[in-house]
């Protein structure tokens, strides 16, 4: 935009005070209740099971919660970052990478091709999607959280399991490390 030949600075968008109050209330009182099923999972370091077995209902619940967490991290940068760091939820989400169901480990359709693959593989995994987003956001504090909880280890384990397969999960793991190289 220009006014009288001068460029106007682009100011960050300020939310409506009502929206701000709602967001504050949500993250203070509701987020813990919403993500309680994720918080009941063991941290990936203490989970002794090689493969996490769950019922279809549990799997669906965790897929939906991971999708919600992904969208919150994507849309509410500051508040979601504070929630993720203060709640210690990332090591529990990493436990889902041990899931038997691939759709629990990985869910990704960030472009048209991925959206098509999502219909071909309707249960693409949701947990890995969160870690990919945190990497792509290129936030040093988020990277520090991933390193603090040693999240790379379960991602490497999952990658080594899928290494010889030519599937969406294997390609996404390769893309994760390619993005890591670029960051």
Stretches found by the model and what they are:
Residues 1-183:
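Extended alpha-helical scaffold regions
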